[in-house]
Amino acid sequence: MSMVYMNIMMAFTVSLVGLLMYRSHLMSSLLCLEGMMLSLFVMAALTILNSHFTLASMMPIILLVFAACEAALGLSLLVMVSNTYGTDYVQNLNLLQC
């Protein structure tokens, strides 16, 4: 396994650990999710380029579309929560209430 793949897998792992450890603020969770999506995109693009598998060449673009939708939805949720509660603490949220 080359060093590039190991670095990308390490970036994904660090983002995952950051998501699991620093769950107190919504903004830090969103940044960790974006890091995970970026490392998945780079890994998919490099794998497709190295294997010359042309049928799957649309997969990284579809992953970017989902990442953009996730970022837009997360930022709109962050704005709504910060306007309602005045902070982005995740502990203050109760998702069972409307």
UniProtKB/Swiss-Prot annotation:
GO molecular function (one): NADH dehydrogenase (ubiquinone) activity
InterPro entries in UniProt: NADH_UbQ_OxRdtase_chain4L/K (IPR001133), NUOK/Mnh_C1-like (IPR039428)
EC class name: translocase
Compartmental location: Mitochondrion inner membrane
Annotated catalysed reactions: a ubiquinone + NADH + 5 H(+)(in) = a ubiquinol + NAD(+) + 4 H(+)(out)
Name assigned to this protein: NADH-ubiquinone oxidoreductase chain 4L
Organism from which the protein derives: Bos taurus
Organism taxonomic ancestry: Eukaryota, Metazoa, Chordata, Craniata, Vertebrata
GO biological process per UniProt: ATP synthesis coupled electron transport
Gene that produces this protein: MT-ND4L
